[in-house]
């Protein structure tokens, strides 16, 4: 953490600039989220910084682009992997916005966070996130869901593999092979992906075919 008056003053200014009217100040401050998080410490990151970011996802695209990139870098500042899923909340919102560059950065950060999750966090937080995106009315969220389904499924196979010797068992045999939470989560992701691949919106379907 920052340990002298100059550093603390600089961090205090960055925190103030997160709320500034000048977009350039907000962009610079948002780009410094990891430094701010390092100065605040994990408890305040969870109690103050993450909720602030959650409430700040209705901003200009330039700010959101920085936010989508930097939030994924906060995994080292949130107090351990057991809290990493808390970063998915703002990233889920950013994965639904209209601007494609913001969504792409948000998807990268979601996958960065997802790779830090335990099996329980994956089923309790990542799969429900995917479900919410799949069911959203706005098609950009469903496009993001389509992009996230394959890597999420791969993580489920990695962290909660089928117990049968052949991990590449056909999907219809997955439940019998693995049983339990892992098989149920994989089945849920498969159903979501099937739904997205037959979506009414061509752009959503194309995301599915591409993956």
Residue spans for each PLM region:
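A general secondary-structure boundary signal
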Residues: 58-59, 65-69, 103, 136-137, ...
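HEAT/HEAT-like alpha-solenoid repeats
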Residues: 4-15, 42-58, 81-95, 120-134, ...
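Alpha-helix N-cap/helix-start positions at coil->helix boundaries
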Residues: 23-24, 43, 61-62, 81, ...
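N-terminal "cap/leader" segments of large eukaryotic alpha-helical scaffolds
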Residues: 1-32
């Amino acid at each position: 953490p920052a340990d002298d008056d100059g550093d603390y003053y600089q961090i205090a200014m960055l925190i103030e600039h997160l709320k500034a009217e000048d977009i350039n100040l907000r962009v610079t401050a948002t780009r410094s989220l990891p430094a701010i998080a390092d100065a605040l410490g994990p408890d305040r990151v969870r109690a103050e910084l993450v909720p602030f970011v959650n409430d700040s996802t209705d901003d200009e695209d330039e700010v959101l682009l920085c936010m989508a990139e930097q939030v994924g870098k906060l995994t080292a500042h949130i107090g351990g992997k057991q809290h990493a899923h808390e970063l998915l909340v703002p990233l889920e919102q950013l994965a639904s916005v209209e601007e494609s560059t913001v969504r792409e950065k948000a998807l990268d950060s979601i996958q960065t966070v997802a790779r830090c999750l335990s099996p329980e966090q994956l089923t309790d937080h990542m799969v429900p996130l995917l479900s919410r995106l799949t069911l959203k009315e706005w098609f950009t969220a469903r496009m993001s869901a389509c992009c996230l389904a394959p890597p999420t499924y791969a993580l489920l196979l990695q962290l909660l593999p089928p117990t049968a010797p052949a991990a590449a068992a056909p999907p219809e045999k997955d439940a019998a092979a693995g049983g339990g939470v892992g098989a149920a989560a994989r089945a849920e992701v498969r159903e979501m992906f099937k739904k997205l691949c037959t979506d009414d919106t061509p752009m959503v379907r194309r995301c599915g075919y591409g993956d």
